[in-house]
Amino acid sequence: MSQQGTGWTAPGAIQRKAILDRSKSIAIVGASSNPSRASNFVLTYLSSSLCDFDLYPVNPRETEILGHTCYPSLADLPVVPDVVDVFRRADDCPAIAEEAVAVGAQTLWLQLGIVSDEAARIASSAGLDVVMDRCTKIEHARFAGGLHLAGFNTGVISSRRA
């Protein structure tokens, strides 16, 4: 799917899987210590034994989330993240895209419900892969076999009687 005027084309499932397969480090911009926030749920999943990522929460108001040191900005990270996973409003994304380019990230990933044509233009024109309106947790689980046609494979919900 091409977004007219941005030069951005949405990567298909094969490309998204390749992005996750080659990535070793993920910076989670907008990470929260609040367990009811989506960013906390995704960080919890990505911290699990199912995943093998080095995780770097980014939030200037936090110092540690789920045992991970939290950093005030992408520039403060001790490594160059492969993926910059964004949990912020679409209006904030162009500035985050510029930061991702400046630190040398490979991928700008905007979470489910977040679309920013300007951020996509900034990142893609600098050679970054761009994923928008997709959840890293859902995509990883999907490719790792944790999702099925009926949804999440939790083993809890069933129509069968015990």
PLM regions and their residue ranges:
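Mid-chain, well-packed structural core segment of small domains
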Residues: 81-115
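Glycine-rich, highly charged phosphate/nucleotide-binding loops
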Residues: 7-12, 65-94
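Hydrophobic, well-ordered beta-alpha structural blocks that scaffold small-molecule cofactor pockets
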Residues: 1-59, 66
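Rossmann-fold NAD(P)-binding glycine/threonine-rich loop
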Residues: 112-139
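A short helix->loop->beta-strand "cap" motif at the edges of active sites that frequently abuts
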Residues: 50-53, 103-106, 126-128
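Short, charged, surface-exposed secondary-structure boundary motifs
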Residues: 65-67, 81-82, 118-121, 139-145
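A charged, well-structured terminal subsegment
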Residues: 139-162
